[in-house]
Regions:
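Short, isolated positions in well-ordered beta-strands
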Residues: 19-21
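Short, surface-exposed, charged amphipathic helix/loop patches that serve as local interaction elements
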Residues: 2-7, 25-133
Length: 133
């Protein structure tokens, strides 16, 4: 399965200035902490206002360490086009889904590669513990 990689950067105008957001390792990890499963992507986009707000504010804060909510940009101080905000959320969702899909594909390949070995180890461990073969 060939899954295209999302763009590493996203351009958005904030307060009249062009800003480029780069999906760095640290930024991606912070997003993954609040979106632990692909099923939550729908919540991010549609139903969970708090999750959506955090993701937007975190992205607009940039690649710096955030330890408290006060470290995030204040949404009331932002002059930003809402359509671009929706596109930003979709860009983040694309990165998260890409990660889960690529990880699942890699894990499936590893499972196929070692299936016989795992079955043999399972059989051996059962026979050593007295379980029937």
């Amino acid at each position: 399965m060939d899954i295209p990689t999302p763009s590493r950067t996203f351009d958005i105008t904030v307060d009249g200035e062009e800003k480029t957001i780069t999906m760095s390792y640290g930024l991606f990890n912070e997003i993954m902490r609040v979106i632990p499963s692909p099923e939550l992507i729908a919540s991010l986009i549609v139903t969970d206002a708090d999750l959506r707000d955090y993701v937007i504010r975190r992205m607009l804060t940039g690649n710096k360490k955030v330890t408290t909510d006060a470290d995030l940009v204040d949404p009331f101080d932002l002059d930003i086009d809402m359509d671009r905000v929706d596109e930003l959320v979709a860009w983040v969702a694309e990165h998260v889904l890409h990660f889960f899909m690529k990880s699942a594909a890699k894990t499936a390949k590893i499972g196929e590669k070692y299936q016989g070995t795992v079955e043999e180890l399972t059989r051996l461990s059962q026979s050593q513990t007295g379980a029937e073969n």
